[in-house]
């Protein structure tokens, strides 16, 4: 219900009716709409973070970029309601997470992978969080676009996004500059 109508437009009465339970049961188990929403968001976050963590656990840097991109976009395709709840959330107090928390969690994990790779390649590891957040932001934005477009296939989109990310990372200068300043 949250995915279809949004947090604000969904009432406890509607949730109870849809679940074929009484309102007091919702209040007893979740404390109200905010508590239920928090459980839904936390469940979705746990699922998508686990999928991405599995995707980046092993493999070459390129494989990790490709697999994590495909894992997230597959989540968007296969769990549209969960993605909608996180992407078009509720008041910040309603959940312990939400899209911002998800992005930070995933970016931290990707940043750890980048930090190790940067150290091994002679790059400044302090820059790793910048690149991790940039990559996560790009993939998330494309995921939001895809929820409206529904084409091309998630696999096709993942190939293009991963190629852009990989080519950028592969040709990353050790000391980036702005062309306007040269």
What annotation goes with each model-predicted range?
Residues 14, 35-44, 51, 86, ...:
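Alpha-helical DNA-contacting segments of helix-turn-helix folds
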Residues 4-8, 79, 121:
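Short coil/turn segments at alpha/beta junctions that flank glycine-rich nucleotide-binding fingerprints
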Residues 172-182:
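C-terminal effector-binding regulatory domain of bacterial HTH transcription factors
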Residues 46-49, 95-119, 129-134, 156-159, ...:
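Amphipathic alpha-helical packing segments from all-alpha helical-bundle domains
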Residues 1-35, 39:
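Helix-turn-helix
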Residues 73-97, 108-115, 144-148:
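Amphipathic alpha-helical segments used for helix-helix packing
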